[in-house]
């Protein structure tokens, strides 16, 4: 056992003495030690109940002959951190979480790992840390939140609350209606109910085989989710000492592609691109961002979920057959798109896991013959405005997939929010929101507030937004993020001026500004960037080490 290094032999007398202080007895030193990486935190709706889930998990682990040791990571709620300087800390928290998992697991030589994430950066952070440790690992999330119910019986979610702000400002709703949405959009614990970043990443864990079936869709705070927790506990005890289930044997080149195929089929959050670029590097199989368009061209988009389709949420996907039904439908269309022989932590191949799954509601999970689009729900655009690429959630486009308009430039998210609220942005404009990339922010803030204001003010089909920052998974509309190179490193987005004409063609995967090479070079010579004052020591460290979005915004020392 890996843990023998801390518990076996006479030289480990002091180590065992310390472990006995935690309650261990003689027999416990013969058992596998299981790390339980929890992310319990009271301020996040998807996490305030995870302490109860970890108790269920640990109890089941003990019953099955292993010794659990729980530790916690930090967490940031992106919705609560949104629209103020707290969002500067969201993406950097991913690195802290990854480092925490690596540190605890390796410092104490634990044999296996169960991760209990749920929201936003916690899932990819734990994946990155687990890949560094490389022991048998199972992910079991807290589960999605149920959708809220509106005054007319319509589905509500967190995005409804953000867009309600713009609707209130333009007097489309009154204060009473605004308060009703506030009080009903998030009715229970769980990761926000649509195909936002958290549920996208939990779904991809299932697609990669590092989580059990149902991980992405079974609702939080249900008996079904509790049983999934117990199953994960029993299974980790079965595989704790089996090298076949080391996480790098589960997450590899084949299963990373499987994840991206599922991502395209379901129109996941654009943040999944950023995180999968980082995760693939930790796994030793770095994704080429340009290659993702090859997947997008091949995979039909068969499932639209909020925010792309506000009436459909994760609970509906669960009832319609779950992720297995989505994967099986894609496999029947073209089995070559997926590595169906890939091993999952349950011991079966991905193909065996999904082969009997059926679509139970074709209004939620479409057949390939009735796909929303013949191409995937995410796209990488290239051109003179983004030589290293940028990302759009094509599934969330409200209007045309082609757009040309005049640039309206803002040098920060705060500037953009004020400008949009004051009516500076009109139909036909392209909002340029820059100096918000990984280095420029620093921290690559999410731009849900500006995009929600645009949609809430009725401009969602008539205005595009491009940024070197990123978007919440709740974002919809013609919103293009992760522009690389970013403005702070001299990227073209930093050279744009008000009135420049920008051409976007999602079907051609292109984004360009109508400027000659001579004009671009002249502007580049004039460009100067002094940088923003950064008071936080941690954010200064992050700014110094972080790479741009085309590399997954990973840290390089």
UniProtKB/Swiss-Prot annotation:
Residues annotated to bind [2Fe-2S] cluster: 119, 192
GO MF term list: 2 iron, 2 sulfur cluster binding; dihydroxy-acid dehydratase activity; magnesium ion binding
Swiss-Prot/TrEMBL keywords: 2Fe-2S, Amino-acid biosynthesis, Branched-chain amino acid biosynthesis, Iron, Iron-sulfur, Lyase, Magnesium, Metal-binding
Amino-acid positions noted as binding Mg(2+) in the UniProt annotation, renumbered to this chain: 78, 120-121, 446
Gene3D superfamilies with a match to the protein in the record: IlvD/EDD C-terminal domain-like
Matching InterPro entries: Dihydro-acid_dehy_C (IPR042096), DihydroxyA_deHydtase (IPR004404), DiOHA_6PGluconate_deHydtase_CS (IPR020558), ILV_EDD_C (IPR056740), ILV_EDD_N (IPR000581), IlvD/EDD_N (IPR037237)
Primary role: Functions in the biosynthesis of branched-chain amino acids. Catalyzes the dehydration of (2R,3R)-2,3-dihydroxy-3-methylpentanoate (2,3-dihydroxy-3-methylvalerate) into 2-oxo-3-methylpentanoate (2-oxo-3-methylvalerate) and of (2R)-2,3-dihydroxy-3-methylbutanoate (2,3-dihydroxyisovalerate) into 2-oxo-3-methylbutanoate (2-oxoisovalerate), the penultimate precursor to L-isoleucine and L-valine, respectively.
PANTHER family, per database record: D-XYLONATE DEHYDRATASE, D-XYLONATE DEHYDRATASE YAGF-RELATED
Subunit structure, as described in the record: Homodimer.
Protein name: Dihydroxy-acid dehydratase
Protein source organism: Campylobacter fetus subsp. fetus (strain 82-40)
Lineage, opening ranks: Bacteria, Pseudomonadati, Campylobacterota, Epsilonproteobacteria, Campylobacterales
